[in-house]
Amino acid sequence: MREITSKNDLAIACHRIVHGGDYTESRTITRDTYHHLEKLSDLAPLHNGAALGIVESCIKQLPGAINVACFDSQFHATIPPHISTYPINPDIAEKNRLRKYGFHGLSYAFITRSVAKFLQKDANQVNMIALHLGSGASACAIKAGKSWDTSMGLTPLAGLPGATRSGSVDPSLVFHYASDVGKLSPASTEHLHISRAEEILNKQSGWKSLTGTTDFSVIAGSDEPKHKLAFDIFVDRVCGFIGSYYVSLEGHVDALVFAGGIGEKSARLRGEVVRRTSCLGFAIDQARNSRDLTEVVEEVGSDQARHRVLVCQTDEQLEMARAATEKGELWDA
């Protein structure tokens, strides 16, 4: 491989864009693509705005490079309408692009491919319940190698709680929480407009609001009541999605897969989640679960269990690089 000695040696700049709207695959960033993503910033003001700022910098600093956008929502384009549609006025929903999109798709694409290889099956033959558990957390039901359902929705706020996100709550809660929820947040800028409601539920909630820390390893390793409560809440919500997706997949599940910083590193979290879902046919092997995990995919479940329990060390950057290399037009130019 040739050594990179200057900015002129960089041929492709690959960007992770959280919200891709209706885009179902990675895109070369043209002026039209950029403007379309700007419009989507209203749906993901806390994510797309910053990412587009980086894209703009790369366009200026790397004029000879091709910029490619990889979307965290693109993996979920296969979610069927009865799952992605919200029961609201359809005309308003279509006009404002209001539906479930889902996120962490780059991670789930990597997990699907890696787990299929581990199980020695074609990816389009694999059913699994995958958990991307980190400071941002989500779950995904993967059917025949495609996203069937996922816990995040219109935005990454829906679903599981995170370090500073509330996850799914009664939508009216925020109106009782503060009187100024509809106003612009002080964190808003000329190019980034977020409401107080978005700021409260995205930045001032989650397990940090309960414990004062965003470090889940501290929470998992403590017996303090506030830490135990946060741990139990997270386990409860994760198990709820596992149960829901198990039914949605009609019990045809090849594996339960843990990924993300917490999913990969917290043996206690994995053990407790699997214990709580043992009625579905999952069981942990304590020795496997407690050892250091070094491979991309490793087994932590019991050989006597009905379903496999795996840990996947996901790699979103590698998935982005793979997506870029598979775009033939970049190499034919």
Where are these regions (language model features)?
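Phosphate/pyrophosphate-binding loops at sites that engage ATP/ADP/AMP, CoA/4′-phosphopantetheine
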Residues: 1-11, 117-122, 242-254
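Short beta-strand-loop/turn "lid" adjacent to the catalytic site in phosphate-handling enzymes
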Residues: 1-48, 66-68, 74-83
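General beta-strand structural signal in soluble alpha/beta enzymes
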Residues: 15, 45-49, 66-71, 77, ...
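Glycine-rich beta-strand-to-loop/alpha-helix junction loops that act as flexible
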Residues: 16-18, 133-135, 256-265
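Glycine-rich phosphate-binding loop of actin/hexokinase-like ATP-binding domains
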Residues: 75-180
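Catalytic phosphate/nucleotide-handling subdomain of diverse soluble enzymes
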Residues: 142-184, 193, 199, 260-293, ...
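Adenine-nucleotide phosphate-binding core of ATP-dependent small-molecule kinases
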Residues: 186-190, 199, 203-250
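Internal helix-turn-beta structural module
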Residues: 228, 232-257, 263-333
